[in-house]
Amino acid sequence: MPSANPAPALHHERSVFDGWRSLVISLYMTLVGYGVLAGIPVISTAWATQLGFSDVQTGRVAGADLGGLALGAVLASLLVAQINRRLLVFLSALVAIAANALCMVLVDYEAVLWLRLLAGTGSGVYTAIAVANLGASSKPARAYNIMLFCFAFTQAGEMFALPRLSMDAIYGVFVAAYLFGLLFLRWVPPRPVEAGLDVEVELPDPELGTVVEHRHVPAAVPWLCLAAIAATYINIGAYWTYIELATARAALDKAWVSNVLVWVSFMSLLGCLVATVISNRFGLLRPLLVTLLAHATIVGMLAAGVTSMT
C-alpha cells in the first residue's frame, strides 16, 4: 500500500556531465588520482624496504603525498568555477607526471618528501575536477556508487600487483596512467552548466500529481560535509599508511597479510552494495553513523594490539 505522504525526491535534469564520455573519463581520472591513496600500504612498505626509509620518514612521505592530495583539492575548489577544467586537468597531470618521474631519479629522503608533496598536489587537483564532474551529473549518487565499485576493484588490483613491482615501476605505473588519461582530455566538459547550491525537489501534489519546488541550501551545509570528510580521511589515511608496516612489526606472515588486504578491498564491494540498498530505505545519516561507530571500534581493537585475529 503506497504511503500517504511519500518522501520528496530530488528533481534531476540532464546536463553535459551526464554524457557517457564525461562519466567514463571522470571515473578513470578519479581512480588514477586516488591511486596512491588506494595503494599506500604497499607503497609505504616499498619506501621502507626498497629506499631504506625509517617508519617516521615513511609516515612523513606518505603524509606529504596525502596532504598534497588535500591541498590540491582545496586549490581546485578555488579555481574550478573560473578556469577551463580541461586546462586544470592538463596542468595538474603534468605536475603529477613530472613529480613521479623525478622520484625515479632522486631517491634521498628530502627530495622524495618534497616530490611526493608536489605529486600529491597535482593528483589532488586532477582528482577534485573528476569528483566535481561526477557530482555535477543529474544523478550524483549513482555516479558515486559506480565510482566506489570501480575503486574497490582498483584497490584490490593495487594490493595484488604493486608488491611485485620495484619502486621505479610503481612510479612508472602512475606516470603511464596520467599520460593515458590525457589522450581523452577532450571528453572533460570545460565549464560547469551553472553555479549555486540550490536544488529542485519533486513533491507530491493531490491535483497535479507532482510539483517541482525550488529550495535553498545553506552555505554551511557543504562546509560541514567537507569537515566530516576531512576528519574521516585523516583517520583512514593514518590507519591505511601504517597497517602493513604494523603487521610486519607484529611478525605476521607477509603473504597472508597481502592476501587479507586484497580481500578487504574486495569486501568494500559488498559494503557499496549494502550502502546502496540501505540508503534507499533509511536515508544516508543513520547508516553513516553506524559505519563510523564500527570504524572507531575496529581502530580501537587495533590500538590494543595488532594480531592475526584483529
Specify the residue positions occupied by each region the protein language model found.
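Structural signature of the two symmetry-related core transmembrane helices
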Residues: L87-A101, R286-M301
